[in-house]
């Protein structure tokens, strides 16, 4: 626990996740005095990677989308040494694996996509049209559209029940941690827009490389880790190591902690995800492609051989398989056995000799984004010099966290009379 000498700064940022780091980048660029305090012994928040006996295990299955506008604005994507997944998915339905590719990312795949054994030809044409619309319309146009649930938006697009249930529900339930697809159609539009326009992958050194890259230009002494914030008030932040006087406070913690520090702030509903990591001597498939369960078992939402995309995630000669389930399952032998059976069915290979490396349970993986969400940008200025940032104030995504932190810092700088810089993307 760092012991603070009496200190006074312009801005205190509470929380060193992506939102807090993005806010720090903007206030630092404006030349105001600031300090970031983080309770954990590292930065990154929910974006973290553990090294275990040569395995690189992210804290839950996470990916980085290169089409998120705030990502290239804050980091050099090339320097992340990205490892990319295939622009499409595989779908297990009965004894066969079917492929559905993203023709916007891989134009040569269009004939294969139209003849794939996933949904009807009409379904595939309608989905291609929907993805093209999301990819080409501006975010403002998409967010001006009438709002409904993600499931209803897919139905209104003319997609069949089978296409929704066998492909889109398993895919999107893993993205939103929402099996019912009650998530706002505005969030759906922005997420599918990014998937259509960008590439999906992970940094070679794990997802933890992202917050490290965001923090890269910041002066290290102003990132105070291992300091738990006890309370915030007008002009004051109290940590377990002392008090910090300030002109403005940005609370950029997880939503539950933010609601504790700011009692007037509604506590959002959170959604959970569970990720099972297995090690194997051989990869069950040879490609870095997300595999979905089209048989509607609703046990494994998706699975992927991480080391097919990023060999750095596994020791030499080994393969790392990630499998994600919606909700929080206890890491018991019974649930492990069920997961093994499902993965054996989906990959079409025995899984008895796979080693269960760990089970990552995230009860608060993502804030729920049910209707209504409007333009996704919730109020961040709370009065009395108090501000709040995080993906719960924007879209539930890496983009949402970064954009919220950047936007909130802009409002803080405006309130202080400092140069706010360009608007958030």
Task: Enumerate the predicted regions with their spans.
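Helical element adjacent to the flavin cofactor pocket in flavoenzyme catalytic cores
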Residues: 188-240, 244-247
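Mid-domain catalytic core of redox enzymes
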Residues: 2-6, 230-336, 345-346
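Glycine-rich active-site loop/strand segments that organize a redox cofactor
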Residues: 48-67, 129-142
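Glycine-rich FAD pyrophosphate-binding loop
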Residues: 28-52
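N-terminal Rossmann-like FAD-binding beta1-loop-alpha1 element of flavoenzymes
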Residues: 9-36
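Mobile amphipathic helical/loop "lid" adjacent to a hydrophobic cofactor/ligand pocket
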Residues: 71-72, 76, 81-181, 196-197
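Conserved flavin/dinucleotide-binding core of flavoenzymes
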Residues: 4, 311-425
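Short beta-strand to alpha-helix junction loop
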Residues: 62-69, 142-148, 152, 157, ...
């Amino acid at each position: 626990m760092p012991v603070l000498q009496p200190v006074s700064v312009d801005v205190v940022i509470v929380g060193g996740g992506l939102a807090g780091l993005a806010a720090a980048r903007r206030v630092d660029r404006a030349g105001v005095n600031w300090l970031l305090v983080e309770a954990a012994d590292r930065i990154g928040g929910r974006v973290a990677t553990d090294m275990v006996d040569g395995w690189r295990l992210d804290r839950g299955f996470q990916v980085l989308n290169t089409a998120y506008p705030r990502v290239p604005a804050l980091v050099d994507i090339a320097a992340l040494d990205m490892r990319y997944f295939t622009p499409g998915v595989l779908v297990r339905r009965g004894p066969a694996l079917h492929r559905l590719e993203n023709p916007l990312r891989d134009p040569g795949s269009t004939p294969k996509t139209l003849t794939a054994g996933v949904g009807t030809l009409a379904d595939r044409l309608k989905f291609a049209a929907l993805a093209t619309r999301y990819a080409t319309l501006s975010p403002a146009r998409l967010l001006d559209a009438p709002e409904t649930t993600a499931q209803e938006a897919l139905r209104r697009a003319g997609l069949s029940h089978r296409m929704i249930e066998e492909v889109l529900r398993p895919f999107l339930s893993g993205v939103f941690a929402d099996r019912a697809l009650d998530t706002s159609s505005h969030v759906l539009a922005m997420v599918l827009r990014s998937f259509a326009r960008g590439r999906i992958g992970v940094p070679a050194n794990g997802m933890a490389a992202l917050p490290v890259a965001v923090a890269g230009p910041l002066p290290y002494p102003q990132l105070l880790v291992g300091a738990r914030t006890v309370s915030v008030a007008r002009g004051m932040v109290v940590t377990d190591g002392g008090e910090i006087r300030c002109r403005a406070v940005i609370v950029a913690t997880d939503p539950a902690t933010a609601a504790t520090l700011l009692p007037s702030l509604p506590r959002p509903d959170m959604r959970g995800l569970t990720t099972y990591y297995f090690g194997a001597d051989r990869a069950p498939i040879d490609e870095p492609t997300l595999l979905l369960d089209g048989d509607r078992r609703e046990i494994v939402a998706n699975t992927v051989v991480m080391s097919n995309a990023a060999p750095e995630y596994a020791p030499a000669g080994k393969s790392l398989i990630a499998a994600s389930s919606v909700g929080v399952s206890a890491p018991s032998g019974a649930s492990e056995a069920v997961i093994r059976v499902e993965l054996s069915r989906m990959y079409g290979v025995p899984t008895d000799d796979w080693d269960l490396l760990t089970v990552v349970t995230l009860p608060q993986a993502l804030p729920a984004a049910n209707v209504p969400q409007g333009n996704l940008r919730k109020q961040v200025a709370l009065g009395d010099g108090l501000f709040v940032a995080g993906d719960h104030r924007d879209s539930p995504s890496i983009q949402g966290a970064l954009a919220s932190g950047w936007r909130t810092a802009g409002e803080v700088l405006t309130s202080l009379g400092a140069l706010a810089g360009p608007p958030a993307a």
